[in-house]
C-alpha cells in the first residue's frame, strides 16, 4: 500500500519536475530560449490550478468498522508550488521576460482559487518571486 501511495505522489510530481527542468535548461546561458521557458510556465500554471481544485480525500483511511488503518501524508498545493515555482524561480528571475511571466502566472493562479488558504500560499510565493525579480532588476 505504501509503495502504491508513493507512486501516485510521484506520478503527480513527475510532470512538474520535467517542466521545471525543461524551463531551467531553456533559460541557461547556452540555450537562452525564454519562449520555451514561458511555455513551460504556462503548462505549470494549468497544472497547479487543476491540482488546487482537486477534491481532498480523507488523510485517514478506515476499515468497515470505522477503525483507522492508514494515515496518509497528503501532498497539498504548497508541495506542488515548492516543486514548481520554488525550483524554477532562481532561473526565471534572471530572465526579465520569464521572471515577469512567472509573476503574472502566480497572479492568474491566485485569482482562480476560491480557498483562502490556497490563495495565501500562492500570494506568498508570488511576493517572494516578485521580490527576487525586483532585486535582479536593480543589479
Placement of each model-derived feature along the sequence:
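Short basic (Lys/Arg) and small-residue
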Residues: 1-139
Amino acid at each position: 500500500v505504501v509503495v502504491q501511495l508513493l507512486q501516485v505522489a510521484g506520478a503527480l510530481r513527475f510532470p512538474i519536475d520535467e517542466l521545471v527542468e525543461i524551463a531551467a535548461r531553456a533559460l541557461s546561458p547556452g540555450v537562452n530560449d525564454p519562449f520555451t521557458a514561458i511555455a513551460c510556465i504556462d503548462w505549470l500554471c494549468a497544472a497547479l490550478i487543476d491540482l488546487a481544485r482537486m477534491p481532498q480525500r480523507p488523510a485517514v483511511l478506515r476499515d468497515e468498522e470505522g477503525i483507522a488503518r492508514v494515515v496518509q501524508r497528503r501532498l497539498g498545493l504548497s508541495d506542488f508550488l515548492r516543486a514548481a515555482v520554488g525550483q524554477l524561480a532562481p532561473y526565471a528571475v534572471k530572465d526579465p521576460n520569464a521572471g515577469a511571466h512567472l509573476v503574472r502566472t502566480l497572479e492568474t493562479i491566485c485569482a482562480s482559487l476560491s480557498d483562502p488558504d490556497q490563495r495565501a500560499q500562492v500570494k506568498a510565493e508570488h511576493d517572494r518571486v516578485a521580490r527576487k525579480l525586483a532585486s535582479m532588476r536593480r543589479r
